[in-house]
Regions:
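Membrane-embedded beta-barrel scaffold of Gram-negative outer-membrane proteins
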Residues: 106-132, 301, 308-309, 331-396, ...
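Repeated loop/turn-to-beta-strand initiation elements of outer-membrane beta-barrel proteins
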Residues: 15-18, 51-56, 114-117, 173, ...
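Face-selective signature of the C-terminal outer-membrane beta-barrel domain
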Residues: 103-126, 148-266, 301
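Gram-negative outer-membrane beta-barrel transporters
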Residues: 357, 377-465
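Conserved C-terminal beta-signal and adjacent last beta-strands/turns
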Residues: 154, 178, 338, 425-527
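Transmembrane beta-barrel wall of Gram-negative outer-membrane proteins
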Residues: 2-68, 93-110
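Single conserved hydrophobic/aromatic residue that forms the stacking wall/gate
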Residues: 525, 530-535
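Structural signature of Gram-negative outer-membrane beta-barrels, strongest in the C-terminal barrel
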Residues: 42, 46-48, 156, 175-187, ...
Length: 535
């Protein structure tokens, strides 16, 4: 990998200042073909006086990366195909090209010594296009993989705005920080055209693949050539933080959230539209709802360095079906979370230990496949666990960053598939941990040198077939990384160089899966170095 980062900041006079960030990264993909390229331009302009601050920023990204779904789990044997993990069975033109644009405008105005007004607007757009040879079956006896040749593009735009007032005042001996506001969002997502039914039997030899970069025929026969999801939300909220003493703090809040949503799909054209499919925008999801949500928290400091905390919050998330019909009333997903913990912090060190419990109901799941696919409310899920984080200086030269997470997340109810009840959810390891050390070698005439390294642990986890009657275990892995960094000045400008070594032992590991009938397994086998220069 090679990359260049530039960051310029300066004043323009009369309260104005500017900043410009440029970042370019490029590397070869770790498997047998593919490139990863990312370029970012981010200018911003700010202005302020003694009462008002204004910030206008823009960010543009150009993205090119492989569209690699990994490999397919052979569900009959609970194994992966017996080929090198670096060998791809799709095509060199399996790439995603994308552009993102983000605009942010923020104003902060001081109304008085204790009150201020904040307002903001943001716009985000994400456009992408990809070609794909989707692997639908791997036959180890005939040594072939079957693919469907597909093509897709999409465009998503998000408008959001916020307005709030913040005040600090006292009620008797109790200091308060009060916030009240409103926010609104409009999310417009359009996918299509999607071509996925022209070439469905593109076979390739898994031992000696011949890549031809086929392009999808402009056909679609399953009524999902165009998919859309239009979501509007409005939230009104109040929150107060009360400082009863120097040691005891409580916060409480209310939020009312409302949404209106329309989503669905339709055919490519009349010639591709079959009976029962939509030729125009007739939604599978057309709903609106609202809910009052509660939040409560408390902090108690035993000493200036040791504190305990507790938090309770509720969530409300609209669901939608784009590509599949809806089974009955698609109720919004609702959740409740509770966290308690302890924290230690001083000028150079902090550590946090927390216990959490998250419960969700009205959990939706797509079941079936093809024309029989349907979105259903299947029941309840619960996540419980422990988190530990530690960061800080062991000595003046040696620092540490460590964390550990234990997560037990399972289905409590599943009306369609009772075998899913009490099973650890797919793709969620119970144990994850990391430990990294960094050492400042010291200042020299030519600059400063830092070195460091550590390990990441990803625990084993399971994937399931469509009715949860079979479980496939993915193994745990320990991955080692290291770096060396050099900081200096060139012509009075700070410059840093860093060499990163990732996965030093060349370990194959599996970060995720997708699907539940013929599981696609994303895996990593990357031993790489990265050279970065920051200005």
């Amino acid at each position: 990998l090679w990359g260049t980062q530039l960051d310029f900041t300066g004043g323009l006079g009369n309260g104005f200042a500017y900043r410009f960030i440029y970042d370019k990264q490029e590397k070869d993909y770790w498997r047998n073909f593919g490139k990863v390229k990312n370029t970012t331009y981010a200018p911003s302009l700010s202005w302020e006086n003694d009462k008002t601050k204004v910030l206008l920023s823009y960010e543009h990204k150009d993205i090119l990366e492989p569209f690699d779904r990994g490999t397919n789990l052979l569900t009959a044997t609970n194994a992966l195909p017996d080929i090198p993990v670096s060998r791809r069975l799709d095509e060199p033109n399996n790439e995603t090209t994308a552009k993102t644009d983000n605009i942010d405008f923020k104003i902060e105005h001081k109304l008085s010594d204790g009150w201020k007004l904040n307002a903001g607007y943001s716009y985000a757009r994400y456009k992408y296009f990809y070609d794909q040879a989707r692997i639908t079956n791997v036959n180890v006896k005939t040594r072939t993989a079957r693919r469907e040749i597909e093509q897709q593009q999409g465009d998503q735009r998000v408008h959001s705005g916020t307005l709030n007032i913040v005040g600090e005042f006292g009620i008797g001996d109790i200091a308060n920080r009060f916030v009240a506001g409103i926010d609104a969002m409009r999310n417009i997502r359009d996918l299509g055209p999607i071509y996925n039914k022209g070439i469905t039997n593109s076979d390739i030899n898994i031992d000696n693949p011949k890549y031809t970069s086929p392009v999808a025929a402009h056909k679609n026969g399953n009524g999902n050539a165009y998919q859309y999801n239009y979501l509007k939300t409005v939230g009104v909220y109040i929150q107060d933080t009360a400082y009863f003493t120097d040691n005891f703090i409580m916060t409480g809040g209310l939020r009312y959230e409302y949404f209106d949503q329309f989503a669905g799909r339709h055919c490519l054209n009349a010639a591709n539209c079959k009976k029962g499919q939509n030729l125009t925008k007739t939604g599978n999801t057309d709903q609106h709802d609202g809910k009052l949500l509660y939040q409560l928290g408390a902090v108690y400091k035993f000493t200036p360095h040791i504190a305990t905390f507790a938090n309770y919050s509720e969530s409300f998330r609209p669901q939608m079906s784009v590509a599949t019909p809806v089974s009955g009333d698609l109720k919004p997903e609702q959740g409740k979370s509770f966290e308690i913990g302890a924290k230690y912090e001083n000028s150079g060190f902090n550590a946090t230990l927390a216990l959490f419990n998250i419960s969700k109901r009205n959990v939706a799941e797509a079941v079936g496949s093809g024309s029989n696919a349907q979105l259903n409310i299947v029941g309840k899920q619960r996540s419980r666990g422990v988190e530990f984080d530690l960061n800080g200086q062991i000595t003046d030269s040696l620092s540490v960053a460590a964390n550990y997470t234990y997560t037990k997340v399972k289905s409590l109810e599943n009306e369609l598939y009772p075998d899913a009840v009490n099973q650890q959810l797919s793709g969620v390891p119970k144990h994850q941990a990391s430990l990294f050390l960094a050492y400042n070698v010291g200042e020299f005439d030519f600059g400063n040198i830092r070195v460091g390294g550590g390990a990441r642990y990803l625990g084993s986890w399971h994937a399931y077939n469509s009715d949860y009657t079979k479980a496939y275990k993915l193994p745990h892995a320990v991955v080692y990384d290291a770096f060396i960094a050099y900081d200096t000045k060139i012509s009075g400008k700070k410059v840093s160089f860093q060499l990163n070594g990732k996965n030093l032992t060349d370990k194959t590991y599996y970060p995720s899966t997708s699907g539940n009938a013929t599981n696609t397994v994303s895996y990593t086998h990357l031993r790489a170095h990265e050279t970065l220069m920051n200005l």
